[in-house]
Curated annotation (Swiss-Prot):
This is 4-hydroxy-3-methylbut-2-en-1-yl diphosphate synthase (flavodoxin). Pfam families: GcpE (PF04551). It comes from the Bacteria. The gene is ispG. Its cofactor is [4Fe-4S] cluster. Signal peptide: none annotated. One of its GO terms (biological process) is terpenoid biosynthetic process. Converts 2C-methyl-D-erythritol 2,4-cyclodiphosphate (ME-2,4cPP) into 1-hydroxy-2-methyl-2-(E)-butenyl 4-diphosphate.
Amino acid sequence: MTPQVASDSAVPWPRRLTQAVNIGHLTVGGGHPVVVQSMTNTDTADVVASTKQVAELWRAGSEMVRLTVNNAQSAAAIPRIAERLAMMGIEVPLIGDFHYNGHQLLADEPACAEVLAKYRINPGNVGFGKKRDLQFGQLIECAIRYGKPIRIGANWGSLDQMLAAQLMDENNRRKQPWDAAQVLREVLIFSAVGSAERAVELGLPRDRIVLSAKVSGVQELIAVYRDMAARCDFALHLGLTEAGIGSKGIVASSAALAVLLQEGIGDTIRISLTPEPGQSRTQEVIVAQELLQTTGHRAFTPMVTACPGCGRTTSEFFQELAKTVQQHVRDKMQVWKITHPGAETMTLAVMGCVVNGPGESRHANIGISLPGTGEMPVAPVFIDGEKSVTLRGGNIAQDFITLVDDYVERRYARFPD
């Protein structure tokens, strides 16, 4: 695929036209906003722990949550988890993640099949040998019976070995054989798209199918999805598999997904981070939201611009204020998204000295330019490009937060006084 030439406008390219897939109360693809999803790492059979983590992910902003369904106990737990979430007032589509035995679990636990909003199927391990087509067909029949969409998710860590061997043999007979990376890419794409077309032949509508083909290399992922997007009109789920821990996982996922999203490819995303010991699982949700927001695809919470600091900003106060303001607006968005729609598009600036402080603050809806080393101990505040007030004294942080809240009330209140 030849990359497009960017237009003069500083916006992402038009979204790729795909099938629109209804998943619970959400619609994925068909031009709808890119959806953020996540996955639990609890034992699904532990109803209390799994319900708690789904709720945490939902509160952080996950719009769909996937759970492992690997045995009879976990399948039986799904309806109980859904019931507890409903009692908590949480409406979030639950996705069942099936490998090896999904056909049997869905047949044995009809309540699980009914409650799940979508089934994730791995074409690389849905069945082996002669059983593959039979067990794949049973899964599709279940999706048709219960009116559920599916995601056919190929992964280079669990490739269909028979398909891989077949395509490698075909490649060896070429006059000009592809390199190993091209063959791998073809196996992934053929596995996903071919399985989807087989599902359609079995009677599953095209608008109940989402595809993914995940690898752990940035350039490989970009190449796979560009190729797959050119071959089909199915909605696509993006994710860099096994992205890793900490900053490496964040950077790798963002580097790959940002390119694809900019090209209009992708209808739902997950950031597959390895949590650090003791770290909340919700980080993957926050990173996904920030990726979509900083690239101009969606808005979730007011964005805070802050300078990195230099020798002019020896005080840590501006860093602490930037962190406090970011956490404040993120916490408030739980209420603001209902009472003050549009507040999520607001921009704020917390700057540390006079060099870029006033200018950057003028670009924001509301910004503060704190004094740097040797500057007067005053902090001018700019609102919608105009200097509004100068803050002094020991309550600058709280005074600025009050100004932010007042601004939100005046500009975004659903029912202004």
